[in-house]
Amino acid sequence: MSQLNPKVGFVSLGCPKALVDSERILTQLRSEGYDIVPSYDSADVVVVNTCGFIDSAVTESLDAIGEAMNQNGKVIVTGCLGKRPEQIREAYPNVLAVSGPQDYQSVMEAVHEALPPKHDPFVDLVPDYGIKLTPRHYAYLKISEGCNHKCSFCIIPSMRGKLVSRPVDEVLREAERLVRGGVRELLVVSQDTSAYGVDVKYAEKMWRDKAYQTRLKALCEGLSELDAWVRMHYVYPYPHVDEVVPLMAENRILPYLDIPFQHASPRILRLMKRPGAVEKTLERVQNWRRIAPDITVRSTFIVGFPGETEAEFEELLSFLDEAQLDRVGAFAYSPVEGATANDLPDAVPEEVKQERLARFMEKQAQISAARLEAKIGTVQQCLVDAIEGDIAVARSKADAPEIDGLVHIQNADQVALRVGEFVDVEITESDDHDLYGDALPAAARPALDLKVL
């Protein structure tokens, strides 16, 4: 093999199960073009697969780490002792990374970070963050597949199956790669974001030497460690969603919830097989705003659901008045093949559905316009999406791409801006959907710490 290939030293300790782990790691290293070398001094980096079952094994593992540190200095630790990263870090604070047993991907990530694989122009055509169809500065981060709910209007479970959550460490590593590749905004998506981890009983995984549960709050805490906006989408209104709102108040993730309420009539919600405690929903929205005054609440609704009476539709309009939601999408009910709602009696005539949809959207447009108008005179941090001549198009923390509004920066020709850059914008005008304003000069902008947004 060519001497130009990167070289890895490897120490394998412990039981046969650990030996199999070592074999798998070595196989992956060789498949990526790394040379495996027998001595510390000829290695560019050393991997130590440890044992931690009994005290003598712990001592042997720590001694092996120490020997590798003394003779090489670039050491990645994995294996059973890696479940106690504080013990390793206390003895050897300068090890490059620590991961637990069977965590092959973390080992490979650490090797890649310390010693990138040799570039092969014939096969290495994909960046480590993958192929993306979004602009480079934002990306969707899918955390699960499928859904355990049986909403009567939906056929997603029959198409995509039951909830399958991705391991939290895998999600966090993907997010880390995306941010390293230039992503400034992570949009967390799934069929049911708030159910994340239910199917795996909130299994705990290690990332950056810290344990994280496969749970929405823990995921948000991990994502908040990255230098990017974090925006939550498709959040089913479980009570535990309330746990992430304090993180929004602390500016650790964006103060934004995309949470589909679907209706406000308890009877219609029961027919939809959705949560029906409307008064509690209103209380929760009010409480979110007390905790995080800048929170943006987006929701979606269905009008003209089978059996919906005029009185029940009026309940929905009253809910809009009370909730004062920032952004809303609405749809006239349309039968979907395979949905159980198709069998419900008292279908609403099409012309009535369309008339109710128009009334619904007219009321919400007034609410949204008033909430946007209240932002005139404020300074909003924005992410630049495009520059078109002397106008730049950006989004504030309140605006997800494609579905929400825009911030039109009207002095882009006077202030040096770049796509994917954060900029503070003084808002001067608004309309029913968008904001307009002027970017502040760089000297007038506060120093940006992307971890505190």
Swiss-Prot record:
Residues 6-116 form the MTTase N-terminal domain. [4Fe-4S] cluster 1 binds at residues 15, 51, 80. Keywords: 4Fe-4S, Cytoplasm, Iron, Iron-sulfur, Metal-binding, S-adenosyl-L-methionine, Transferase. Residues 133-370 form the Radical SAM core domain. It catalyses: L-aspartate(89)-[ribosomal protein uS12]-hydrogen + (sulfur carrier)-SH + AH2 + 2 S-adenosyl-L-methionine = 3-methylsulfanyl-L-aspartate(89)-[ribosomal protein uS12]-hydrogen + (sulfur carrier)-H + 5'-deoxyadenosine + L-methionine + A + S-adenosyl-L-homocysteine + 2 H(+). Its EC number is 2.8.4.4. It holds the Pfam family Radical_SAM. InterPro entries: Elp3/MiaA/NifB-like_rSAM, Methylthiotransferase, Methylthiotransferase_CS, Methylthiotransferase_N, Methylthiotransferase_N_sf, NA-bd_OB-fold, Ribosomal_uS12_MeSTrfase_RimO, rSAM. Disulfide bonds: none annotated. Residues 373-441 form the TRAM domain. Its cofactor is [4Fe-4S] cluster. Binds 2 [4Fe-4S] clusters. One cluster is coordinated with 3 cysteines and an exchangeable S-adenosyl-L-methionine. It is found in: Cytoplasm. GO terms for cellular component: cytosol. It comes from the Bacteria. It is an enzyme of class 2 (transferase). [4Fe-4S] cluster 2 binds at residues 147, 151, 154. GO terms for biological process: tRNA modification. GO terms for molecular function: 4 iron, 4 sulfur cluster binding; aspartic acid methylthiotransferase activity; metal ion binding; protein methylthiotransferase activity. CDD domains: Radical_SAM (cd01335). Belongs to the methylthiotransferase family. RimO subfamily. Catalyzes the methylthiolation of an aspartic acid residue of ribosomal protein uS12. This is Ribosomal protein uS12 methylthiotransferase RimO.
